[in-house]
C-alpha cells in the first residue's frame, strides 16, 4: 500500500504520526527497506464521518525477518498514546520505564510514534539476544562480536522458534560491515533510484542449529554499491568454514569487501592515468574518450597512407588487473554484413605494474608492429 493511499484512510488527527512512519520510517540496519503499514481498520462507529482508520499492522524489517506489530490508537482521543500487540512474539515484554517517548507521549510531535517504535525495536533486540543464552555456542558467537565495537554496535539478532522434537533453535546474525564507501567514484553511483538510502553492506549469517553444524552466510549490498562493484555476481564470499566462528569469519568478509572497493577506486584513478597518457602520446590522433569514467578511447592513426581506428572500449572496472582489449578497425574495408572490418587484440605487451605512460609507449610500439599484418588482412578479407 502506497503512503498516499494509507494516509487517505487514516483519521486526520492521527495522520501526522502515520506520515512520519511511512515517509521517513527507516529503523535498524537495513536502510533499503522502510516501515510499511497494512490492515488498516477503524475502531469508530459506522456513523463517524470521513476517514476514520485508527489501527493497523506495522511491518518492521529486522535481522532478515519482518516483524508484524499491531498498533491501536483511539481516533476519539488522538492525544493518547497507542497500544501495541506484538503478534507472534507473545513472550516479548518491553520494559515501560525504558520507553521514554511512550511514557512522555507528545501528541504535538509528528515523530513521536516513530521514536516509540525505535525504542521498542531496541528492546526487541535485547530480548532476542537474551534468548541466545539457551545455547552456549550461539551465546559465545554473540559475546565475542559484542566485544568488538565495530561489530557489536551494528548487529541484529533473531533467534528462531524451538524445534518441539529436538529442543534446538536456529539463529540469524545480521551485521553491518564497517567498510568505507565514500571514495567510490560518483559516476558509478549514478544509475540508481532517486532515494537509494544509505550505502551499506549487510552480512547475514544463519545458524540452522545451536551447535553450528549448518551455517549459511549471505552478503547483501545496497543498490548503488552493488552497481558500483560490478553487479550481484561480482563478489563471492567464502563459505563458513567448519569449526570456525563469527569473530574469525566476519573480518575476512569485511577485508574481502574492502579490497574490492579499493580495486574499484584504484581502477578509476589508473584508467584516468591511462587515458591521460594516450592523450599525451597521440595528441590530435585522439577522436574521442570518456571524460567521466575513463572507460573508452578511440584513436585515428595512419601508417603509409593507410588510415585505421584503434578502440580501447570498456576499460575494465578492475583495470589494470584486467587487461583491456584493443580493437583495430579499417576506415576503408567492410565485412559482408556492412560493418567496418576489425580485429580485436588482447595478445599484446602488457603488465598491470606499468604506469600509464609506459602502457602508452608500449602500445605505440605495438601499433607499428601490428599494423602491416592488419592492413594485409583488411585487404584480403574486407570489401572496399
Curated annotation (Swiss-Prot):
It comes from the Eukaryota. One of its GO terms (biological process) is positive regulation of DNA repair. Residues 30-147 are annotated as: UEV-like 1. It holds the Pfam family BRE. Disulfide bonds: none annotated. The keyword Cell division applies. The keyword Nucleus applies. GO terms for cellular component: BRCA1-A complex; BRISC complex; cytoplasm; nucleus. Residues 275-365 are annotated as: UEV-like 2. It is found in: Cytoplasm; Nucleus. Keywords: Apoptosis, Cell cycle, Cell division, Chromatin regulator, Cytoplasm, DNA damage, DNA repair, Mitosis, Nucleus, Repeat, Ubl conjugation pathway. Its main location: cytoplasm. InterPro entries: BRE. GO terms for molecular function: polyubiquitin modification-dependent protein binding. Belongs to the BABAM2 family. Component of the BRCA1-A complex, a complex that specifically recognizes 'Lys-63'-linked ubiquitinated histones H2A and H2AX at DNA lesions sites, leading to target the brca1-bard1 heterodimer to sites of DNA damage at double-strand breaks (DSBs). The BRCA1-A complex also possesses deubiquitinase activity that specifically removes 'Lys-63'-linked ubiquitin on histones H2A and H2AX. Component of the ARISC complex, at least composed of uimc1/rap80, abraxas1, brcc3/brcc36, babam2 and babam1/nba1. Component of the BRCA1-A complex, at least composed of brca1, bard1, uimc1/rap80, abraxas1, brcc3/brcc36, babam2 and babam1/nba1. In the BRCA1-A complex, interacts directly with abraxas1, brcc3/brcc36 and babam1/nba1. Binds polyubiquitin. Component of the BRISC complex, at least composed of abraxas2, brcc3/brcc36, babam2 and babam1/nba1. PANTHER family: BRISC AND BRCA1-A COMPLEX MEMBER 2. Contains 2 ubiquitin-conjugating enzyme family-like (UEV-like) regions. These regions lack the critical Cys residues required for ubiquitination but retain the ability to bind ubiquitin. This is BRISC and BRCA1-A complex member 2. It comes from Xenopus laevis (African clawed frog). The gene is babam2.
Amino acid at each position: 500500500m502506497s503512503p498516499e493511499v494509507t494516509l487517505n484512510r487514516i483519521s486526520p488527527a492521527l495522520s501526522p504520526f502515520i506520515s512520519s512512519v511511512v515517509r521517513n520510517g527507516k529503523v535498524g540496519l537495513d536502510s533499503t527497506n522502510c516501515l510499511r503499514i497494512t490492515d488498516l481498520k477503524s475502531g469508530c462507529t459506522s456513523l463517524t464521518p470521513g476517514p476514520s482508520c485508527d489501527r493497523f499492522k506495522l511491518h518492521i524489517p529486522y535481522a532478515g525477518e519482518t516483524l508484524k506489530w499491531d498498533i491501536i490508537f483511539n481516533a476519539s482521543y488522538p492525544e493518547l498514546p497507542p497500544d501495541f500487540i506484538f503478534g507472534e512474539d507473545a513472550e516479548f515484554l518491553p520494559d515501560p520505564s525504558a520507553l521514554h517517548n511512550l511514557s512522555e507521549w507528545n501528541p504535538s510531535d509528528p515523530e513521536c510514534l516513530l521514536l516509540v517504535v525505535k525504542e521498542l525495536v531496541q528492546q526487541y533486540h535485547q530480548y532476542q539476544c537474551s534468548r541466545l543464552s539457551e545455547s552456549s555456542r550461539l551465546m559465545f558467537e554473540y559475546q565475542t562480536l559484542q566485544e568488538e565495537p565495530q561489530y557489536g554496535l551494528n548487529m541484529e539478532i533473531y533467534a528462531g522458534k524451538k524445534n518441539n522434537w529436538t529442543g534446538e533453535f536456529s539463529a540469524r546474525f545480521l551485521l553491518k560491515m564497517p567498510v568505507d564507501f565514500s571514495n567510490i567514484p560518483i559516476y558509478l553511483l549514478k544509475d540508481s533510484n532517486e532515494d537509494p538510502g544509505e550505502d551499506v553492506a549487510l552480512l547475514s549469517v544463519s545458524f540452522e542449529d545451536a551447535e553450528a553444524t549448518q551455517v549459511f552466510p549471505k552478503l547483501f549490498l545496497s543498490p548503488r554499491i552493488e552497481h558500483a562493484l560490478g553487479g550481484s555476481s561480482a563478489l563471492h564470499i567464502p563459505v563458513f568454514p567448519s569449526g570456525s566462528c563469527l569473530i574469525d569469519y566476519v573480518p575476512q568478509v569485511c577485508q574481502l569487501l574492502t579490497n574490492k572497493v579499493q580495486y574499484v577506486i584504484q581502477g578509476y584513478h589508473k584508467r584516468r592515468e591511462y587515458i591521460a597518457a594516450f592523450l599525451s602520446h597521440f595528441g590530435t590522433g585522439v577522436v574521442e574518450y570518456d571524460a567521466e569514467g575513463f572507460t573508452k578511447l578511440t584513436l585515428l592513426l595512419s601508417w603509409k597512407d593507410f588510415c585505421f581506428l584503434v578502440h580501447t572500449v570498456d576499460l575494465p572496472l578492475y583495470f589494470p588487473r584486467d587487461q583491456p582489449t584493443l580493437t583495430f578497425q579499417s576506415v576503408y574495408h567492410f565485412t559482408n554484413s556492412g560493418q567496418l572490418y576489425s580485429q580485436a587484440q588482447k595478445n599484446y605487451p602488457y603488465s598491470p605494474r606499468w604506469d600509464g605512460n609506459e602502457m602508452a609507449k608500449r602500445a605505440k610500439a605495438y601499433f607499428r608492429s601490428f599494423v602491416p599484418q592488419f592492413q594485409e588482412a583488411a585487404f584480403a578479407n574486407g570489401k572496399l
